[in-house]
Amino acid sequence: MMKQVKFQNAIRTATLSAGLFLSASAFAQQITVKGHVVDETGEPVIGASVKVVGGKTGAVTDIDGNFSIAADKKATLEITYIGYEPLKVVAGQDLKIQLKNTSTTLNDVVVIGYGRAKKNDLTGSVTAIKPDDMSKGITSSASDMLVGKIAGVDVQTGGGQPGSGAQIRIRGGASLNASNDPLYVIDGLAIDNNNLTGTSNVLAMINPSDIESFTVLKDASATAIYGSRASNGVIIITTKKGRAGQRPTVTYNGDVTLSTVQKKYKVMNAGEYKQALTSLGIDTSGLGTADTDWQDEIFRKALSTNHNISIQGGLKDMPYRVGLGFEDNNGIVKTSWMKRYNTSVNLAPSFLNKHLNINFTAKYMFEKDRYANYGDAIGNALTMDPTQPVRVNDEMYNCVGGYFQYLDNKGDKISDPNWTKMAKSQVPQNPVALLNNQKIIANTHDISSNLEVDYKIHGFEDLHLHAAIGAQYTDAKQHNDINKYSSSNNYFGWYGTDHQYKYSIEGKAFAEYAHKFGVHDIDIMAGAEQSHYHRTTYNFGSGIDEYLRDTNPELVDGEWNYVNNPQYKANTMWMSHNSLVSYFGRFNYNLMDRYLLTATFRADGSSRFRDGKKWGYFPAAAFAWKINNESFLKDVKWIDELKLRLGWGMTGQQNGIDDFYYTPKYTISDTYAQYPFGNTYYQTMRPTKYNPDLTWEKTTTYNGGLDFTALNGRFGFNIDGYYRKTTDLLATVSIAGGTNFGDNLLKNIGAVENYGVELAFNAKPIVTKDFVWDVTYNVGWNHNEITELETGSQDWVWTGSKVSRGNNTLVQVNKVGEPLNSFYVFQQVYDENGKPIEGLFVDRDGNGKIDNDDRYCYKNPAPDVIMGLTTKFIYKNWDFSAAFHASIGNYVYY
């Protein structure tokens, strides 16, 4: 017993001793780890998180970047901070830790014309952004992602129709009749900007969820490499791709939106309308008994959905990505909707130890739209009699489908004896009937593909050979079904089809040599390109006298003879094509990473001009000085970038010119213009107007800018000033009768100038371990003025489209000393309270009467100032963002 007890006590004593030893040993292994965390420039990182991997202890770096934490001697520490790559280190004494910054953009590679460049090596006015860096929001088009995000880029969204396109202007307009749209380059393929019937948005082919980045080239030193297509700037869009060795990743995002009318127009209700007429002494016996809010009858709350799914990854040497998207967008005006399907494929295999790199992209888009007559529906909702009902239970209104309409006696062409009335014209129309009595459906298919091959010469890796071929095909078919009860085509209706298709093929090849000789860094590129564009249009439409057809068919080959139809419209078919041949080159020189020089040249030959005028030549040059790399600023570590930029360049313009306008063409007449020979009528060949003296529009741009970034990307701004002048402006002007085959002609007639200032500002006011506040702001001011103009007998020329309401005439002109597309109006007279007196205008020429000589230029549609503000809050894995944009000084006519 005694031995047993002693044995147990011995075990207990040994166990206790071992426990005390292990505890003391464990206590002895823990140390206090101290360290100092800096960024790539040596500046302390404040608020970085330091954690023991697998443990619960942690610390945060102080204002000097220092930290202290208790950890086992061989423990692993993980240091993380928003905007930096995570880093793991083994615990030790006096650690010196440097984090790699992933948020700073100075060394980001930016896509430019026919190549790439580091952002801090750019010499021209170039802005690159990523959708993830911006306020995400809900977007249905790539153009929505640019609204208010870039200084000097004005994005005016469409009129509310689902899927409607946007008008994008970079530094204002520079042309009268030619295009003011920028050039779009998507994954290396230049996109044909000419929209077809049924297509409203040239960027609709891209799913916004597929976009990796935008690069906007503004000044001529950056855009001249694109020559005649780049007078209005260039927007380069790069889509997302997989990464080599990446595991397959499936991503889904979707959104649901509810759209409503922000604010209805204030109009009189039925009681107020009756009272107003009575006070004016107008007989109200013809008014109805209803109280209809016509705006409520045409507007609705519209629910829309958007779904996107993608899979991306990378085999050993072949990154891939496939994306699918579907958008179901309903408009706030009843009957309007849009459905869009997108798919994209990106493959980027590499071979021969990454010396041979291939990039293949393909995109397909199908869009189906139902268009509503927005303008007429809304306009008539504001003017329609509120005392009338939407529908009337009276046989007299059967001729308009039972809707209330103002009626008139039927015309002589109405053969149906049961059709007693017709819709009256030149009066307000029932807006609900306008929407329901017409059905316009458009189907659009768009497919594009681009194959790029880049070969880095073995044994001479500084030389790259690059070749690419791409194509785009678009087919658009719009069916117009306006039934016989409509007010616009009462009795006959209208049934027609507009079918258009276009395709473009682009091939290019260039060589690029880059090498560094000590402090001299050079990059030389030269190449050639050829593009071909084709367009075909086919239209057919007809109204039908159904009673005449049914009672007197006069069949021809078993079908109704449309020639006997009083509303017959002949078939029309039109096709055309043009080509562009180009040679281009670029030279970049960098001395000591301080002084940068870029020179580019491009020669374009166009089939739209005659021999002797086919070629346009577009040089450009730019200089940049990296002031922060000078010796006197080397020790100023808080400045990341301070760069001065100066640039000059020339670009051209040929869009807006009909193909082969330099030579007479002949068109076949329709059935209404035939020539009789005996008892037979024959269609004729008619010559069209032409101008063999047309030449390129030419735009010369001067640009100066300053880029500044500090505090490791926490603060920065860019400021640019520019002057741009366009000469040999293309515009259609009146000509003397008999001098050509028409009464007007497209000519080179003048010059216009734009100048302005742009400022972009970004800051991170708060940056902590888990929270970041990011703010960006941009503002741009632009002045636009016509300096030369050949006008003929008047000192102005008409422009724009006719206004459908009111005087049904043109209301915009171009005139020397005025902005483009100025409104040409009468000067309103106001009462003592500042309210306009209806129908009373100023007799500006003092001749005692109000006539067209009293009209004057007043305001224009282009804004003087555009600005955008984006603020974003990031807390751990959550973010909240808001975006605002404004345009100031632009006017509309209504």
Residue ranges and their predicted role:
Residues L580, R586-N590, D774, N778, ...:
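Exposed, low-structure sequence patches enriched in small/polar residues
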